[in-house]
């Protein structure tokens, strides 16, 4: 199906209905030729005449094997698609007074995210006067990064943005969700990891 779409994009041989073309190709003297002469040159080489730039004046045509040309175009499309792979960012939220159980629970999830190739955006959320403990939040995030050094590296050191102190980690090994540096802005998937709360009598809920 994709090959059919490619075929529709390019005119070849007798389908090229113009008076003259600019000819390029291997073992070809680049220049402007009447269409009849360009077709003859392609035929003598056992190749096809492929119009690669129809909007140029005159249109640019390449002398090449058409099937080889389609293969090259398909390969180029795959490479471009690979460069545009979305970067997945998973979010992990901490409180400034995070206990060891909560910390280890989220650390385990972060390891899994980095192993699958996702970036991890960890942050400490400061509620009300808890902003006074921002230094404690920074220490927590640096500890988090240190415990994950075998899985990811720090892309952004802890920085305070409003009520959140954020650190960004990127996987050490490329996974299915990672992308080359040339990729566009990452897509943030907000999967905030919180610690499961055990049920208590009266269904009381405890806050983090």
From Swiss-Prot:
GO terms (BP aspect): ribosome disassembly
Keywords assigned by UniProt, alphabetized: Cytoplasm, Initiation factor, Protein biosynthesis
GO molecular function term, any single one: ribosome binding
GO cellular component, one term: cytosol
Record-linked Gene3D superfamilies: Translation initiation factor 3 (IF-3), C-terminal domain, Translation initiation factor 3 (IF-3), N-terminal domain
Principal subcellular localisation of the protein: cytoplasm
Cross-referenced InterPro entries: T_IF-3_C_sf, T_IF-3_N_sf, Translation_initiation_fac_3, Translation_initiation_fac_3_C, Translation_initiation_fac_3_N
Entry-linked Pfam families: IF3_C, IF3_N
Superkingdom field: Bacteria
Subcellular location: Cytoplasm
Subunit structure: Monomer.
Role, per record: IF-3 binds to the 30S ribosomal subunit and shifts the equilibrium between 70S ribosomes and their 50S and 30S subunits in favor of the free subunits, thus enhancing the availability of 30S subunits on which protein synthesis initiation begins.
Family statement: Belongs to the IF-3 family.
HAMAP family reported for this sequence: IF_3
Name of the protein described by the UniProt record: Translation initiation factor IF-3
Primary gene name: infC
